[in-house]
């Protein structure tokens, strides 16, 4: 195969080294504090445990 048919893709040096740039938006729609997130998750886990005790599987 002639070398003229082979196309070399130009890859940025940073991506060749395994470095990736992530662009994060600063305008988040919902902001939840980490403490509130932990409290909500504990309440949900407790709710699932209580529901599994009160409602026996068929």
Curated annotation (Swiss-Prot):
Subunit note: Component of the protein translocase complex. Heterotrimer consisting of alpha (SecY), beta (SecG) and gamma (SecE) subunits. Can form oligomers of the heterotrimer.
Any one biological process term the GO annotation gives: protein transport
Lineage: Archaea, Thermoproteota, Thermoprotei, Sulfolobales, Sulfolobaceae
Family assignment from sequence similarity: Belongs to the SEC61-beta family.
Name the UniProt record assigns to this protein: Preprotein translocase subunit SecG
Keyword Ion transport found: no
Alphabetic keyword roster: Cell membrane, Membrane, Protein transport, Translocation, Transmembrane, Transmembrane helix, Transport
Subcellular location: Cell membrane
Function according to Swiss-Prot or TrEMBL: Involved in protein export. The function of the beta subunit is unknown, but it may be involved in stabilization of the trimeric complex.
Residue spans, topological domain Extracellular: 54-58
Domain of life: Archaea
Membrane-side (Cytoplasmic) residue stretches: 1-33
Membrane topology category: Single-pass membrane protein
């Amino acid at each position: 195969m002639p070398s003229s048919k082979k196309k070399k893709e130009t890859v940025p040096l940073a991506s060749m080294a395994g470095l990736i740039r992530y662009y994060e938006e600063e305008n988040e729609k919902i902001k939840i504090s980490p403490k509130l997130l932990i409290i909500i998750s504990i309440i949900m886990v407790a709710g699932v445990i209580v529901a599994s005790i009160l409602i026996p599987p068929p």
